[in-house]
């Protein structure tokens, strides 16, 4: 979940 959130923020 944490990794996904980060990815979303970067995107």
UniProtKB/Swiss-Prot annotation:
Temperature-activity note from the record: Thermostable. Optimum temperature is 40-50 degrees Celsius. Stable up to 60 degrees Celsius and retains 60% of activity at 4 degrees Celsius.
User: GO biological process: what's one of them?
Assistant: regulation of defense response to virus
Q: List the transmembrane segments.
A: none
Keywords assigned by UniProt? Antiviral protein, Hydrolase, Protease, Serine protease
State the superkingdom: Eukaryota
For this UniProt entry, the molecular function terms from Gene Ontology, in alphabetical order, are: serine-type peptidase activity
- Enzyme Commission number(s) of this protein: 3.4.21.-
Q: How is activity influenced by pH?
A: Optimum pH is 9.5. Active from pH 7.0 to 10.0.
Q: What does this protein do?
A: Serine protease which has antiviral activity against cucumber mosaic virus and tobacco mosaic virus.
Q: What is this protein called?
A: Antiviral serine protease
What species is this protein from? Eisenia fetida (Red wiggler worm)
């Amino acid at each position: 979940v944490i990794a996904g959130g980060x990815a979303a923020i970067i995107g």
